[in-house]
């Protein structure tokens, strides 16, 4: 019976399949025993030999045959697969493996035994006149045995090629690769099945002594019926015996060869004992490498020891009372047995890093471990680029996380980033990392990573400068690796910025939120970002500013509503954007085609609106409409059969003229635009490409002027030729070209040569020198000083260990004409220095001779609301203070003399008013295209502006109610009409498509 997934009914039946195997053994025993009489006793020596052989063959077993990490049932004839969430399915497939497909182990052994026993029994009269006799006896025995056994795998299942599926390998090295639902003959891989041996010895010794007192008595009760005299009867009056014995066994099992992943690459390696050392053949995926020594001072691979010893003794005393047939026996006895079994040598993972360690145990209560040093193998250690910069990494074994994640892994412990310059500032960037809250999902059987990661930026003395703490969702499969939290703190753990990200499961088909408290599983859902919140703290760790964003989704994960609430407690900066989507009418899985979009403020006033028509088969936008108060701007698009945009028709102007641009593409790749035509005016520009690197070889403007470009083999620009020049206009050289040899200490540079028409053979060169991280540290320019050619060198830029520019030397002249030479030591030593806070904001700039400018940051209030505050104080103690809102917009500026200027904005960030220190306010009004429509100035009065749908300003009315009219030919201004004085009117004439002398598209005449 198959049940749906997930199973939603209780009491679903489950069926168990037995693991079966069969063992066949053949045994030959040979033995001999002899009895020899000796003076009233008997001596019996014995001995024997035994030999056995056979095999154990598995008939049915469990292996994950298809890689779903659920065990499937395999037998001689077929494989029965399990379902994705457990339980047997009805899928049964036969396999094509020749011979016995399951595990087969052969074994053989020999054993020897020996023994000897002695017995003695005598009767001795007490006296010549007495009828009593003494009965004396004794016995002794000695036995021993020894044996040796060997076993070896004939066929095994193991994943030899690292694809996660068990393959079948035979003793001869032949492999059948598992393809999940069938097998393929892989030829010879290499032989390395398990092989082992065992030795055992045993022995025993025992002995005893007995004594008895006998007498001949006439028992009255035994008189005969015929009244004749009864004959005497021998009666045991007293008897005693003493016996003792000792025995022992000792068994040692050794594994001589086995497969185990020694180096952690996911491939089982072959480890074996050989000549007193442990050797390994590393698995390379398609066979084994040659033998290497794993441990030269160890010879055991896997050893178990079991011993058992016992001692026993007994005393027996018996006696009779007179002639009565009653016997009393006292029989005290005792014994002691001691047995022990332990593993003396084992390859097993002790520290939880997933790698086998070598563990030995000689004495009870003591264990020695040789940890596997392969944990960092194959982990990236360092990267060095051609410029000498790079980074080095080190790793450590993660802490044990307990039940939530019992596995330990190698994690990044430290990261050093260096720029490759030896003579500059101490600027190596150092980071260390901490991890916590790892989680292992036992249902999915995979680790979801760490829930908490801390990144520490370190000072040059390795102390913590600042820390970024990040939290990730790692409890559910669909939510894994999503960041839910971020916190910035300094070295004293003082908070600066805290961020929260909230994700919820939403149904793919509807966008509805899944109730995680009641849902059996999340079903067809996805993790959707539902909310963002950012908190900003002051110096006392009080929250001063909070910003929030909210997201709402529809079907297929489409965002249907976005709310930027801005700063908490401030409604004026809130904006709500709603979106609708086109249906997938053509069933092309094009579910994310936006149909319309609206933006509104907190009063529900419309700020922006647009919608579009699309091609349902290809998802192409055919028409885009943007709505203003009285106009609608329509832009149309056309495409070719390759999906390239071939025509754009812009919005109509006031005369209903629409600009049209047509695009043509290359005929090989159909990807690069090679021709652009302005249809109304007939202007054409062209571009030719090097299709190998996708870069232009030449561009021709609408006047026929050609710019030519050349590149090196690495695709870097090496020359530019302007239309009026010959040879080159700009030439570019680089510190390394294709095939060059890199020399240690070379500084990366790039040189630009400007052609100088007055000195054709001596171009003006500018060389930029960078460090190994690509940061510019110096610039050298050709210059002439006092009639001599020299270099004007910019001061070196030094960076600190956080990548910030902290020192800038002043420029100087350098007689060294080697333009690529990096001059780290300046002759004048003049430099400006800069210090920063935790958030990389400048706090102090010191110019040469001690001139300082200080900056401070915090929070300030305006109108009862908190804002970001920054201040700058110059050397004369003049301070400029600025208040900025959560969007980064300046809301107030206080200049020296306590002169205050204030600014206000709408939700779109458009300036709506500015109030000067005289408390005079200028206001601004915008249309739904973002164009200013009105400005009210305290002196100039009210200015109004009108536009057509194409965005051209068609009129401007000033504060005196005088209107200036603007006229256009498509999108080109042709006439300006002023009020009252027509003589001031202006008319512009443009060059048409036939105009010469670079006049096409340009103003060739102005009439006013």
Can you describe what each PLM-predicted range is?
Residues 1-14, 78-101, 173-193, 276-297, ...:
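Beta-propeller blade repeat segments, especially FG-GAP/WD-type strand-to-loop junctions
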Residues 29-46, 109, 113-143, 205-245, ...:
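Short hydrophobic membrane-inserting alpha-helices and related fusion/pore-forming segments
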Residues 58-65, 153-160, 255-262, 343-350, ...:
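Beta-propeller blade termini
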Residues 67-76, 162-171, 264-273, 352-361:
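Acidic/hydrophobic-patterned starts of short beta strands in beta-sheet-rich repeat architectures
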Residues 379-384, 391-395, 402, 411-419, ...:
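Beta-strand elements of repeat-based all-beta scaffolds
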